[in-house]
Structures are given as structure tokens and as C-alpha cells.
């Protein structure tokens, strides 16, 4: 059941009115119409100004429309059936122009399937591998954005939020039904180059939809993200307090950390680097008692159209709980086969190497790009071998249509089961 949301905004409607009465008593009858007119004219002008503002806001209203068609095939050892999912999504809405420095955005999603040989998480087809794209028709975003304060953006309502690289907070845009947040967000840049981003969240609208028992998470969560440029990159500090009432508070936690990401010219190319560290512990309604660490070290080197990179990412383990990132865009990390959506208690160490090649234009296709990533997984505690994964992708644009081909092959060892996935996706947006 969705929470009822009430939103309010303040406008600025002011006018200077001057009224000077200096007349002898015997002229009152003559002056009275002048007095009435002096009051009426500013009121009429103010009304005309307000009407003009509304007309401008409506004239500046922009439509929102995008569509996606995707086939996903999954072979997973241990299940009697292979999954074949052909799903589509329509997303439509509008964003008004500003009136009293405030804009309204309304957006709906409709997700359905054309081939339904898969476990959508709510259709009961448990003999198939999971493809987490259940049928749904939902209000995706409903927000008011106000910019009346200097260097400040205030967003109220159901909104999309992605912080940094979405490792801790993201919209899970890969899935057909994205993750959104009901709350209030304030972004401020009045303190020089320091950017302050604070959000209060009352409800998390997850990718599983209204019909799922885990489709909505309620609670009081707070996200604080501070960033500042330095000569060697952007330095970010963050504190995320997630308090989720659902599931016995298992996903409630507090995470505090820092991140540095930058690029430097080296020779004929560019060296990119990212380092991050965070510590996490139980918080709020959590019934657990744990503490776990996270760290990331990644380097890339780009020369013209070629980028090579490698890194190590560790989500630490604890006797009670591994380091969790329940609000992240999880598909982006630890392999596209999605075998580590929940971190085991022994944690996950991911050592990876990647290569990308920007091919450019090929025939009718533009922006052709190729990507390959190899992962080696192991436990942070105990050193168990979690297996390996090879991910391949190709993407391009044909006019206004984006085309994506992806393949993931996970080879299990002491964790999970062998799994391979294939996707072909078409995107269109106005």
C-alpha cells in the first residue's frame, strides 16, 4: 500500500501599493473614485502577472516519454527450466516550467511481458530463473522542485536519486521498474566549491512493484553526501543511515565513508583512479549486531578509443552480517550475472580487469562501443573461492534507438551455481 503524500510549496507574490490621500473634506466625493481606482489597478496588474506566470509555466512544460524492449535469457544450473523473458516498458509524463520558482514533474511506468517463461518474483514460476521485471503500472515520479533559495535545489515527493557511482544509492535503472524514493532532498552549493546533498526518505519504492511483499520499504532514512574538488580529483564524504521497518530491520544500517575519484594526463593518455573506504554497522530497527568494512581501489588508462582498467573491491564480512548496499544499483557491480545482490556473511572480494573500445560510427550505427570485464570472486573471511565471471557488451545507436547486447557467464566454485545470461535491448526516448 502506497503512503499518501502531501506536498506544499511557497510562492512569492508581492507588490508595492501606494495610496496618498490629501484632500479637503468638500472634495471627498470627487476623490473616492480615484482612491478605488488606485487600489483596483495594482490588484488587476498583480492578477495579470500571476496569470502570465501560469501561462509561461504551461508553455515551458516538456513531455517525458521513453520506451524499452528487452529480451533476457537465463540458464542456471540446478533449476529445471531456462528463462526466456521478453518484456517492454513505457514511461510517460511531463515536467512543467517554473511558477514561483517551482516546477512539477509527474511520470508513470507501464511494464508488461510478451514472453513470460521466467520467474518475475511475483508470478509463482519458481522453476525458472529470476528475471526481476514483474508486470506493473505505477506512479514512478511525482515531485515538486523549488529553486527560490540561492544556490539551492529542494525536491519534494517521489523522486529518482543517484549518488556518486550509485554503489550505495542508485535508481537501479537497468531493471524495467526503476527504484525511486519518497522524501525531501536539499542540494546546496553556496559554500564555495563545497556541494552539500541531504535527503530524508520515508519510503523506498523498489523494483519489484506494488504487488510484491518486498516492493515497498518504509522507515526513516537519511542520506548526507558532501563533495569538494581538489587538484587530484573530487573528494567525497558520505553518511547514510538506512532504517527499514520491513523484514525485521535486517537491511537497516549506518554507513560512513569517503571517496576520491580523479583523472590525470599521463603521456598521450589519461590515468583515471578511484579509491573509497567505508565502515558499516547496525542501526535503527536492526536486530543484528555487526560491523563490516568496504574498500575499493581502481585504476584505468585511456589512449584515444581504448580504455584498460583493473581494480579490487571488497565488501567485508562479519560473523553476523556482510557489508550490504541495499539501495545501490547492484547490477552495475560484482558481475552482470547478479550472483552477489546480497553479501554473504563472509564478505566478497572482487578482483577484476576490464577493457573498452570506442569503435565510433559503423554504417548506419553511431557510437558503437565494446566492453569486456573479467571478475575473480572470493570470500573476504576464510578465503573460499566464489568462482569467476566473464561479461561482454556491445552498444550502439541507430537514429533515436539505442541498441545493447550483453552476455554474462558466471562459473561457480564454493558459492552459488553456474549461470549464463544474455540480453538484447532496444531503447527509445524523445
Annotate each PLM feature.
Residues 1-55:
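Cleavable N-terminal export/targeting peptides
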Residues 43-63, 102, 344-347, 356, ...:
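Outer-membrane beta-barrel biogenesis signature
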Residues 53-75, 100-106, 194:
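Transmembrane beta-strand segments of Gram-negative outer membrane beta-barrel proteins
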Residues 65, 156, 355:
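Conserved, mostly hydrophobic/aromatic
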Residues 71-76, 318, 336, 351:
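Short, solvent-exposed loop/turn elements at domain surfaces
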Residues 72-88, 98-143, 148-149, 154, ...:
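Surface-exposed loop and membrane-interface regions of Gram-negative outer-membrane beta-barrel proteins
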Residues 150-152, 172-320, 351-353, 358, ...:
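Signature for the C-terminal beta-barrel architecture of outer-membrane proteins
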Residues 322-346:
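Flexible internal linker/loop segments at domain or repeat junctions
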Amino acid at each position: 500500500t502506497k503512503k499518501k503524500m502531501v506536498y506544499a510549496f511557497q510562492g512569492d507574490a508581492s507588490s508595492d501599493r501606494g495610496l496618498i490621500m490629501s484632500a479637503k473634506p468638500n472634495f471627498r466625493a470627487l476623490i473616492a473614485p480615484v482612491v478605488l481606482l488606485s487600489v483596483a489597478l495594482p490588484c488587476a496588474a498583480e492578477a495579470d502577472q500571476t496569470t502570465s506566470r501560469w501561462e509561461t509555466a504551461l508553455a515551458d512544460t516538456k513531455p517525458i516519454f521513453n520506451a524499452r524492449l528487452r529480451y533476457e535469457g537465463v540458464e542456471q544450473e540446478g533449476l529445471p527450466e531456462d528463462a526466456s523473458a521478453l518484456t517492454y516498458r513505457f514511461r510517460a509524463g511531463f515536467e512543467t516550467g517554473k511558477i514561483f520558482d517551482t516546477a512539477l514533474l509527474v511520470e508513470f511506468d507501464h511494464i508488461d511481458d510478451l514472453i513470460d517463461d521466467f520467474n518475475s518474483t511475483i508470478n509463482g514460476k519458481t522453476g525458472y530463473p529470476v528475471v526481476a521485471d514483474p508486470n506493473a503500472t505505477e506512479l514512478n515520479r511525482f515531485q515538486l522542485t523549488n529553486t527560490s533559495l540561492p544556490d539551492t535545489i529542494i525536491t519534494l515527493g517521489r523522486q529518482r536519486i543517484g549518488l556518486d557511482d550509485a554503489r550505495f544509492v542508485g535508481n537501479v535503472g537497468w531493471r524495467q521498474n526503476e527504484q525511486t524514493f519518497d522524501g525531501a532532498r536539499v542540494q546546496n552549493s553556496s559554500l564555495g566549491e563545497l556541494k552539500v546533498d541531504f535527503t530524508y526518505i520515508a519510503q523506498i519504492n523498489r523494483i519489484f512493484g506494488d504487488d510484491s511483499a518486498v516492493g515497498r520499504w518504509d522507515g526513516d532514512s537519511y542520506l548526507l553526501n558532501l563533495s569538494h574538488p581538489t587538484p587530484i580529483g573530487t573528494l567525497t564524504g558520505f553518511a547514510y543511515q538506512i532504517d527499514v521497518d520491513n523484514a525485521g530491520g535486517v537491511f537497516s544500517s549506518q554507513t560512513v565513508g569517503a571517496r576520491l575519484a580523479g583523472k590525470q594526463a599521463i603521456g598521450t593518455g589519461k590515468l583515471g583512479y578511484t579509491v573509497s573506504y567505508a565502515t558499516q554497522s547496525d542501526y535503527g530497527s536492526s536486530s543484528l549486531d555487526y560491523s563490516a568494512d568496504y574498500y575499493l581501489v581502481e585504476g584505468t588508462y585511456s589512449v584515444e578509443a581504448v580504455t584498460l582498467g583493473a581494480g579490487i573491491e571488497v565488501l567485508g564480512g562479519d560473523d553476523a552480517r556482510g557489508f550490504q548496499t541495499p539501495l545501490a544499483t547492484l547490477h552495475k557491480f560484482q558481475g552482470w550475472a547478479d550472483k552477489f545482490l546480497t553479501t554473504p556473511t563472509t564478505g566478497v572480494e572482487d578482483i577484476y580487469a576490464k577493457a573498452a573500445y570506442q569503435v565510433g560510427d559503423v554504417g548506419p550505427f553511431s557510437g558503437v562501443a565494446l566492453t569486456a570485464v573479467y571478475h575473480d570472486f572470493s570470500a573476504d573471511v576464510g578465503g573460499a573461492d566464489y568462482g569467476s565471471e566473464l561479461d561482454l557488451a556491445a552498444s550502439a545507436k541507430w537514429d533515436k534507438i539505442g541498441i545493447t547486447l550483453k552476455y554474462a557467464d558466471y562459473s561457480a566454485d564454493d558459492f552459488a551455481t553456474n549461470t549464463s545470461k544474455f540480453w538484447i535491448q532496444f531503447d527509445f526516448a524523445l
